[in-house]
Every structure is written in structure tokens, then in C-alpha cells.
């Protein structure tokens, strides 16, 4: 039952269509309050959101449910997802909640949770909360009237987050002489660009005028080519593209070339290994990361540990293995020394530190990783049947794997947040990548639509 609610990154869907309705959000607040309330002390919840118009709806509904269960709610307004994770730890809160659909368009929204340590909730806890939300038999254990919660607005949350971010950058280093273009996707980080200016950089801003409807609209991490054009026009040193909730980063070099999460991870891993600071010489990434990244780590005396897709699974593996660097090709980058989740602005500062230390163009520094040709194609599906239960899909998959003969990879997976099957093919020969991706997508369209 609960799997109808939570995907790989919390609850997500189209606004005013189940499950993204005010009614579900109210019950979500009641359920979360019921689950996390314990003892006689006052309980704190941090709620942040991105810039979607519908954020007001879900912020109010969640707040009502939580306060009804005796939780005090601290609303921080538009705020990056990683900022809510940080503030949950910093303010000693019991729970952090983010209202965002990340890189999705404005008509979607979502809800995700952080525990008191700033980590995303385990699947089992999400499932318990979801079962309370969905069950018609749930009996709410309301507190007495004098013990209901209050709602507060925190005005200095942005300042706290910026101080924390700047702490991750060397105190004796500045960004004097660096010119960058920052694309905030008209999202949660729209007002935070001055942080780079405080460190000395010249900043050209785009995607920093949200109106509630333009989040991720032809801007941000899904449209790096637009950023690349602007970087070249401005003669900037690099471009930084965030998504709607600023938990991911895509970078553009001074020539306008796009660098994805794999390239950024390779640069950061190389820097940490060079300084003897990469624990176990291990990098954690997902099954989507390019084979070239895995080979790069091996060639440099390290290793790559792969996880299922989702930065939460990367973080879980990092905690288990004692790794300090991990991420996703999509731009979620986790620096465990400073953060418990993906943080686009934090990752940007770590990359800028390398750029300043090396004093070389980004296009040269990124040349350490030559990616194998890779293609990802989405196929819309009516329902997510297990691939192993569809003989035609299994036959096509086996045939492609045999033809690649170990010189490439094929990955079929369902999106955790959309009704989409994803086909990923990777090989040394780009023509084979195109051919096999098209063939497999055709089989999925025929048998899963």
C-alpha cells in the first residue's frame, strides 16, 4: 500500500491529483507528528519549500497536521533541500520536511523528510508513515488542547546556511578574479548567489526571478546548454547550474562544454586522493555512472562502489563503508565531511577550491575523465511490471548483452518518481549505443505501454 506514496525521493506527483493533495498532506502531517512525537518535551519540525506556487498549500496543510499532534513548526520559506537538512541538525529539530519536486515542472510538487541527523528517512520509516496516511482505520492520538503545537517563521535561515557553506571553503582563500555564471533554475537558491560575491567572485545571475510558475522552465540543471552559451558570451571561467531545490549541480567549463556529476566526482576524487584524504580511496556512485569513472578509480588505485539510483542510497552506502565522497551522474554530490545529503552550492565551492589551487582552466582539469558514449532514453508506461516477467524484454536484453560482450553496459530501470521506464546503454562504439538504445526502447514501448 505504502509504495503508492513514496518513491526514491519522497512523495511526488501533480498538484491536486492524488497523492499530491491538501488532504494527503494534512494526513501526512498528522502521521509524521504521531510517529516522531515521544516523551513530554516540545518537538521541533523544520519546513522548507522551493518556489512553486503550490508550496503554500502543502506548507499550510503539513503545518496544521503537525501542530495538531503537538509539534512546533518552524517555517523557513524558500530554501534548498540541503539547507533544510542542515537546519534540522543545526536547530536540534526532531524532523525536517522539504516541499519540492526537485527538477520537475511547476505543476508537480513533492514532500520529503529528514531525521534529526539530517539524513533522509529509511524506506521502512517512510512506509510506516504512508500506511498511517492511507489507512482508513488510523486512530490519531491527539494531545490535550494545551499541548498542541505552534507555528513560527524563521527569518535568518538563509544567513545561517550561507555561514555554514562558507565554512566549507578554506578561510585563507578567496574567489578574487573568478567570473562565474549562476543558474538558479528560478528555484529555492534564487537569493543565494551573493555568497560567491562575498568570497570575491564576479557573478552573473540567470534563473533568479521566480514567479511561482517558472521553476525549471528552460533553465537550471536540465538545460545546461543555455548556460553554456551565456558562459561563452560573458567570457566567464565557468557556469554553475542548480535544479529547483538546489540539491544537484551541473557545471559548464569556460568553452561552454557540459560537465556532469561523473566528471565532477572524478575531479574531486582525484584531488582528495592527491591529498591523502579519500577514505579507503573509495568513491560511491550509482548504477547510472559511466564505466569510465569506474576505470578511472581503478587506474588511480581506488575503487567505485555502485548503489541503486537515488542519493539516499549513496549516502547509506557512504555511512556503511566510511566513504566521504559520493554522488550521482545527475549532479547529486555528497561531501560527507560537511553534509549529509546532496548539495549543489556546497559542491560548487569544493570545485572552485580545486580550480583556485590548480590555477588552470576548467576544460583542462576536467580532461582527466573521458566518458564512454552513453545514452538514456525514457519510455512512458501504464504500469511498472517487473522486467523479468516480460519475456520479450528479457530476450532483447540478453541479445544486446551478448553483442556487447563485456565492452559495454545495459541498464533497464523504472523511475522512482515518474511513470517511466529508463533504458541506458553504454559502449565504446557510439553507433552501437544508438542502435541498442533504440531497439530496447522499442521493445519496452510495444510490451509495457
Curated annotation (Swiss-Prot):
Protein name: Phosphoglucosamine mutase
Phosphoserine modification, residue list: 102
Keywords carried by this UniProt record: Isomerase, Magnesium, Metal-binding, Phosphoprotein
Record field: catalytic activity: alpha-D-glucosamine 1-phosphate = D-glucosamine 6-phosphate
Active site: 102
NCBIfam families in the cross-refs: glmM, PRK10887.1
GO biological process: carbohydrate metabolic process; peptidoglycan biosynthetic process; UDP-N-acetylglucosamine biosynthetic process
Family note: Belongs to the phosphohexose mutase family.
Cofactor note: Binds 1 Mg(2+) ion per subunit.
Cofactor or coenzyme needed: Mg(2+)
Species in which this protein is naturally found: Maridesulfovibrio salexigens (strain ATCC 14822 / DSM 2638 / NCIMB 8403 / VKM B-1763)
PTM description: Activated by phosphorylation.
Gene Ontology CC, one term: cytosol
Function: Catalyzes the conversion of glucosamine-6-phosphate to glucosamine-1-phosphate.
Annotated positions binding Mg(2+): 102, 243, 245, 247
CDD domains attached to this UniProt entry: GlmM
Amino acid at each position: 500500500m505504502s509504495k503508492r506514496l513514496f518513491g526514491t525521493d519522497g512523495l511526488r506527483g501533480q498538484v491536486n491529483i492524488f497523492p499530491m493533495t491538501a488532504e494527503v498532506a494534512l494526513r501526512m502531517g498528522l502521521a509524521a507528528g504521531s510517529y516522531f512525537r515521544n516523551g513530554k518535551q516540545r518537538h521541533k519540525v523544520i519546513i522548507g519549500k522551493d518556489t512553486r506556487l503550490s508550496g503554500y498549500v502543502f506548507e499550510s496543510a503539513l503545518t496544521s497536521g503537525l501542530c495538531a499532534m503537538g509539534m512546533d513548526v518552524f517555517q523557513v520559506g524558500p530554501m534548498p533541500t540541503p539547507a533544510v537538512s542542515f537546519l534540522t541538525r543545526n536547530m536540534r529539530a526532531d524532523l525536517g520536511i522539504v516541499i519540492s519536486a526537485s527538477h520537475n515542472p511547476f505543476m508537480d510538487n513533492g514532500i520529503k523528510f529528514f531525521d534529526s541527523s539530517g539524513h533522509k528517512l529509511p524506506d521502512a520509516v517512510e512506509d510506516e508513515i504512508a500506511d498511517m496516511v492511507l489507512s482508513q482505520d488510523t486512530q490519531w492520538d491527539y494531545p490535550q488542547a494545551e499541548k498542541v503545537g505552534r507555528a513560527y517563521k524563521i527569518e535568518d535561515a538563509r544567513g545561517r546556511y550561507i555561514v555554514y557553506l562558507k565554512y566549507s571553503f578554506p578561510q585563507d582563500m578567496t574567489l578574487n578574479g573568478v567570473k562565474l555564471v549562476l543558474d538558479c533554475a528560478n528555484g529555492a537558491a534564487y537569493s543565494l548567489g551573493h555568497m560567491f560575491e562575498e568570497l570575491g567572485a564576479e557573478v552573473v545571475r540567470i534563473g533568479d526571478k521566480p514567479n511561482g510558475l517558472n521553476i525549471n522552465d528552460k533553465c537550471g540543471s536540465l538545460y545546461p546548454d543555455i548556460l553554456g552559451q551565456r558562459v561563452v558570451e560573458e567570457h566567464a571561467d565557468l557556469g554553475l547550474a542548480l535544479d529547483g531545490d538546489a540539491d544537484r549541480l551541473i557545471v559548464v567549463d569556460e568553452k561552454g562544454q557540459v560537465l556532469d556529476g561523473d566528471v565532477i566526482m572524478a575531479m574531486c576524487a582525484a584531488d582528495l586522493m592527491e591529498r591523502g584524504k579519500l577514505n579507503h580511496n573509495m568513491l560511491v556512485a550509482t548504477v547510472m555512472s559511466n564505466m569510465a569513472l569506474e576505470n578511472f578509480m581503478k587506474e588511480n588505485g581506488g575503487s567505485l562502489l555502485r548503489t541503486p539510483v537515488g542519493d539516499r542510497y549513496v549516502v547509506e552506502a557512504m555511512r556503511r563503508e566510511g566513504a566521504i565522497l559520493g554522488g550521482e551522474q545527475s549532479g547529486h554530490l555528497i561531501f560527507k565531511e560537511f553534509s549529509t545529503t546532496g548539495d549543489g552550492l556546497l559542491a560548487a565551492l569544493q570545485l572552485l577550491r580545486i580550480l583556485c589551487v590548480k590555477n588552470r582552466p576548467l576544460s583542462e582539469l576536467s580532461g582527466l575523465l573521458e566518458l564512454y558514449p552513453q545514452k538514456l532514453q525514457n519510455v512512458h508506461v501504464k504500469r511498472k511490471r517487473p522486467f523479468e516477467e516480460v519475456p520479450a524484454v528479457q530476450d532483447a536484453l540478453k541479445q544486446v548483452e551478448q553483442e556487447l560482450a563485456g565492452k559495454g553496459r545495459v541498464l533497464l530501470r523504472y523511475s522512482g518518481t515518474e511513470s517511466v521506464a529508463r533504458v541506458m546503454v553504454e559502449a565504446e562504439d557510439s553507433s552501437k549505443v544508438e542502435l541498442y538504445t533504440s531497439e530496447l526502447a522499442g521493445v519496452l514501448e510495444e510490451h509495457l505501454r
